[in-house]
Amino acid sequence: ILGREKFMTIVTCGRLSFPFSFAGNASGYIYNKALFRKVGLDPENPPTTWSEFTDMLNTFKDAGINPLQGSVADAWTTQAPLASLAGTLVPESKYTELKQGNTTVQELWKTTVEKESELFTYSTADTGVTYQQGTQNFAQGKAAIIPLGTYALPQILLINPDIELGFAQMPATDGASEQILTAGDDVMLTIGANTKHPKEAMKLVEFLMQKDQLDAYADAQSAITPLKDTYFGNDALETVRPFFEENRLADFCDHYIPSSINIGGYLQTMVTSGNTDRFLNQMQTEWDKVQARTFE
């Protein structure tokens, strides 16, 4: 899926299900190419290190342009930068260690959440607006970047079809070659194990998995196809093509966190307060509660 020779496996009630990946997305940030040019930045070559990234934000601030549009009123949007940064900073094997009790949330995410907390301090406008208002503000040219994934592109283009957008991986360290793009499945196809119409269902899946159908959906949703010859449904995504070609991809870190933990709510508080230690301690407490009632 998305450049890797495997399918995502979902275990339900002790039975295995193997969905086909139909469309994918990626996490990073969307940027306004016109504003890049206005301050003398090359929109075709976004920053590749954390220092370059923060320098870019300061360049916009110095020019009197809001560097970053937040949408923190909708807590789930704070999970996007966490996933973007953790893709580079936290190897996926560390989540197995967390589950085994061989590491802690503090050790796992300390640097990640500190960088996310810093990220929002670069905004010169109200970050506590909704996703709807935030994407509207961005579409109207009121900010240089919005730290959301590819899934937000259609919403922005719906508001302003003429805006020239770019999409980039959010660098998390000062080593350009170390950067990893957070990407994953957005839509998957399955067939019920006990369906009365297996042949008909398979025909539908086979139809939808044809390249023409995959590409058409990708075009409509600015999505990414799951084929080895990856197709990007929006030219804005071309800047992240090398990550797919070089298999520098990681899953969303919050996929490793049980849904019973309100990670978005805790992140929302962390971003607005800047108290990263409280967030890490809250997450550890909630993680321990889940593990205490989990039997395998």
Model-derived features with residue positions:
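Hinge/lid segment of periplasmic solute-binding proteins
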Residues: 1-33, 54, 80-83, 166-167
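Short, solvent-exposed loop/beta-turn-alpha elements that line the ligand-binding surface or hinge
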Residues: 1-2, 46, 89-111, 158-160, ...
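Conserved C-terminal helix/tail region of periplasmic/extracytoplasmic solute-binding proteins
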Residues: 37, 43, 215, 242-296
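Extracytoplasmic/periplasmic substrate-recognition and gating elements
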Residues: 39-42, 114, 157-220
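A local structural motif
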Residues: 40-46, 100, 117-129, 142, ...
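Short helix-initiation/N-cap motifs at beta->coil->alpha
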Residues: 48-54, 126-140
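Glycine-centered hinge/linker elements that transmit conformational signals in sensory
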Residues: 54-60, 98-127
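Alpha-to-beta junction loops
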Residues: 63-66, 140-148, 163
